[in-house]
């Protein structure tokens, strides 16, 4: 689940062959305004590829729990981690991401995290079929909000 961005929508189209369910939210009012006024970006955007009902955090969490993989599609210029990365760690879900900087983190494991190119996303069958490799609790705990606050207060 993610907010509509042109790059995210295009990535969803490129990933259709893998038959993933990728939810992209868009405000229905602005969608129709952009379609009526024929914004170029919306020329090929189909209503059926979007979700117009917002989900609360509980619904999003429920969807993530029932998923085998989570998609982390970062903004083009983003370098840091998104909430989706932490969700995948806590829920022990495999992560498919466009963020190549994730390799530098101690929790990175190519068995659990697949880095894709947004222009030509290729997802190996082996990645999809292999089991999630548990990350040590010690590593996960250091990314908990309580730990971040503790580190800030110590500085």
Predicted segment positions?
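Pol beta-like nucleotidyltransferase catalytic core
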Residues: 14-15, 47-48, 70, 90, ...
């Amino acid at each position: 689940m993610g907010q509509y961005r042109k790059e995210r929508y295009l990535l969803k189209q490129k990933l259709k062959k893998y038959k993933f369910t990728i939810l992209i939210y868009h405000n229905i009012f602005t969608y129709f305004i952009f379609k009526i006024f024929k914004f170029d970006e919306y020329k090929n955007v189909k209503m059926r590829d979007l979700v117009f009902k917002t989900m609360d955090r509980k619904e999003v969490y429920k969807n993530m729990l029932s998923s085998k993989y989570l998609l982390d599609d970062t903004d083009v210029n983003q370098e840091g981690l998104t909430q989706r990365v932490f969700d995948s760690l806590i829920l022990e879900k495999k992560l498919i991401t466009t963020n190549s900087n994730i390799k530098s983190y101690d929790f990175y494991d190519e068995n659990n995290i697949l880095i894709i190119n947004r222009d030509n996303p290729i997802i190996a069958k082996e990645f999809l079929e292999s089991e999630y490799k548990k990350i040590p609790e010690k590593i996960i705990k250091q990314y908990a909000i309580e730990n971040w606050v503790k580190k800030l207060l110590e500085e």
